[in-house]
């Protein structure tokens, strides 16, 4: 890449970054937080944060990258995607009408809400316990990170339930919403994330998500400022780099440490070059249609229920890894959101996907606002826990693609909804047995005096 070519790419990158950052800033000033703000920051991180890192790798370490015209296509496709997404998100689908009382879809009380977070936490802890009994601490047993996907590891399906510890702790926080509950959320979820990091063998997702939710709650409540958020972001990048070194068993120093930091940080937070690689091989792609979305559900079907279930699921990430890159190392390489759309239907699917994503984020913001307006604090805690708990799925959306997002968000909704139903059923059984006693002012006063 020549300096002239880099200059042209830099101008496009700067214009796209300023365009998205400006719209995000205006939205932040208007509402302080919603899921449009979160997705916009996530989109910036995924598709634009990596460009400066790539530039340093090219000019400082002479690392080979895709041709400049392909990198330009990647930047422009990301910028155009966001423009279509933003217009879709801001388009009002129906006329604003005055709020009229409606019969609520469901209600929550204190006992049902507490039962819900206990069940969610129980699912996570029991899953971790069973996985640990089968495999021990994989971080200290395996020689390479790719081995966690091998046949040596049993009970892999249990990992999908680990994440429900975070929604459980979110319910606990939203029931109190003070600084102590906020700090308790951070300590409990990060400690759990570190535990799963050691047990699973290097998976950092729970730590990243817990830290991100903690920061956004702090921004919403005004407990941290923007400069504190930026400082925490830098700390998070350094922390993720250190965990990556431990995961891959690397011991580096000097120039090698700087080089390793650049490419690991780029691959962790901003795999935009994967989109460029996909576009570089555009003519070799056999468009998959909506099949990757259907195939991604295969992993949730037990083998005893479907004996002939394919052992290898050809979703967009695996198609990109195996068919496009011819990489069979055992690790799936993230195609990114836009890359998954290209795999499914080529360039035509990019604006269509942007419209779909705009509607998805719009729905989450509608649900979030519903929680903000809810007068029943127990129901509000459940709604907010569901919305913030889905942040993991939005990260999957930006990094892994639309197919991975759809299967995971459906799984999340089913498990979360099942926990709600079980909590309500248990409450009904306890109430029928006479074990539930309503609190009265006199009993509360007696407890305080006693």
UniProtKB/Swiss-Prot annotation:
It is a multi-pass membrane protein. One of its GO terms (biological process) is enterobacterial common antigen biosynthetic process. GO terms for cellular component: plasma membrane. It holds the Pfam family WzyE. InterPro entries: WzyE (IPR010691). Probably involved in the polymerization of enterobacterial common antigen (ECA) trisaccharide repeat units. NCBIfam families: PRK02975.1. This is Probable ECA polymerase. It comes from Escherichia coli O139:H28 (strain E24377A / ETEC).
């Amino acid at each position: 890449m020549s300096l002239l070519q880099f200059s042209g790419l830099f101008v496009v990158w700067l214009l796209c970054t300023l365009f998205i950052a400006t719209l995000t800033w205006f939205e932040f000033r208007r509402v302080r937080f919603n899921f449009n703000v979160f997705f916009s920051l996530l989109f910036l991180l995924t598709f634009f944060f990596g460009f400066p890192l790539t530039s340093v790798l090219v000019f400082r370490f002479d690392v080979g990258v895709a041709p400049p015209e392909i990198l330009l296509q990647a930047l422009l496709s990301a910028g155009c995607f966001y423009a279509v997404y933003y217009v879709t998100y801001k388009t009002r689908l129906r006329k604003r009408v005055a709020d009229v009382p409606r019969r609520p879809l469901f209600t929550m009380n204190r006992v049902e809400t507490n039962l819900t977070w206990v069940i969610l936490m129980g699912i996570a802890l029991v899953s971790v316990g069973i996985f640990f009994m089968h495999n021990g601490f994989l971080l200290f047993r395996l020689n390479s990170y790719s081995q966690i996907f091998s046949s040596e590891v049993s009970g892999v399906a249990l990992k999908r339930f680990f994440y429900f510890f975070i929604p459980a702790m979110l319910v606990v926080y939203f029931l109190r919403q003070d600084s102590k509950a906020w700090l308790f959320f951070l300590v409990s979820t990060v400690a759990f994330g570190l535990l799963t990091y050691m047990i699973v063998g290097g998976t950092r997702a729970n730590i990243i998500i817990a830290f991100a939710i903690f920061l956004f709650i702090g921004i919403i409540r005004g407990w941290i400022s923007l400069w504190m958020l930026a400082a925490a972001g830098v700390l998070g990048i350094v922390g993720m780099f250190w965990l990556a070194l431990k995961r891959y068993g690397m011991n580096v120093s000097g120039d090698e440490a700087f080089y390793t930091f650049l490419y690991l940080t780029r691959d962790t937070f901003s795999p935009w070059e994967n989109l460029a690689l996909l576009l570089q091989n555009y003519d070799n792609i056999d468009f998959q249609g909506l099949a990757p979305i259907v195939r991604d559900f295969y992993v949730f079907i037990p083998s005893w229920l479907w004996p002939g279930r394919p052992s290898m699921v050809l979703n967009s990430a695996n198609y990109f890894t195996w068919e496009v890159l011819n990489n069979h190392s055992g690790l799936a390489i993230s195609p990114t959101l836009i890359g998954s759309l290209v795999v499914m239907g080529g360039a035509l699917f990019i604006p269509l996907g942007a419209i779909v994503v705009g509607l998805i984020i719009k729905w989450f913001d509608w649900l979030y606002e519903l929680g903000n307006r809810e007068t029943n604090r127990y129901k509000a805690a459940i709604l907010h826990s569901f919305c913030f708990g889905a942040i993991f799925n939005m990260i999957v959306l930006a990094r892994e693609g639309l197919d991975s997002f759809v299967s995971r968000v459906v799984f999340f909704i089913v498990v979360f909804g099942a926990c709600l139903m079980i909590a309500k059923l248990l409450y009904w059984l306890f109430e029928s047995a006479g074990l539930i006693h309503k609190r009265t002012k006199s009993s509360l006063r007696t407890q305080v005096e006693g």
